[in-house]
Amino acid sequence: MADPAAAQNYPLLKLLHSYTPTTPPRPIPKPAPWAPQKPRRQITNDFEGVPSSPTTPPSECDSVPWTVLTEGSTLHLTAQTKTGVVVVVQLHL
């Protein structure tokens, strides 16, 4: 120690001379848990077997006029109720 007064003020400094730094051995790492890989889920096309052109399904409302029109990727469904109210539905794909 360079300063004897420091050893009196800080008695723990005396331990530094007897301390020899050692690096503890590293523990052997555990192997990663092994599990069989799950098969990847394949997304099937929801549109398989669906006709490419829209068709009007049979309905109990055949007595009520209604139309189905397509413009690009938009589907327009127009119907009129028995009371005369016109309902328009647009579906953008």
Swiss-Prot record:
The keyword Zinc does not apply. Residues 22-36 have a biased composition (Pro residues). Coiled coil: none annotated. Residues 18-64 are annotated as: Disordered. Phosphorylated by host ERK. The phosphorylation triggers a structural change that enhances keratin binding and protein stability. Pfam families: Pap_E4. The major E4 form is first synthesized as an E1^E4 fusion protein from spliced E1^E4 transcripts, such that the first few amino acids of the E4 protein are derived from the N terminus of E1. Assembles into oligomeric complexes. Interacts with host CDK1. Interacts with host SRPK1; this interaction may favor expression of late viral transcripts. Interacts with host cytokeratin components KRT8 and KRT18. Contributes to multiple aspects of the viral life cycle including viral genome amplification, suppression of suprabasal cell differentiation and egress of newly formed virions. Induces host cell cycle arrest at the G2 phase by associating with and preventing the nuclear entry of host CDK1/cyclin B1 complexes. Inhibits cellular DNA replication by preventing loading of host replication licensing proteins MCM2 and MCM7 onto chromatin. Within the cytoplasm, associates with host kinase SRPK1, a splicing factor regulator, and inhibits its activity. This is Protein E4. It comes from Human papillomavirus 35.
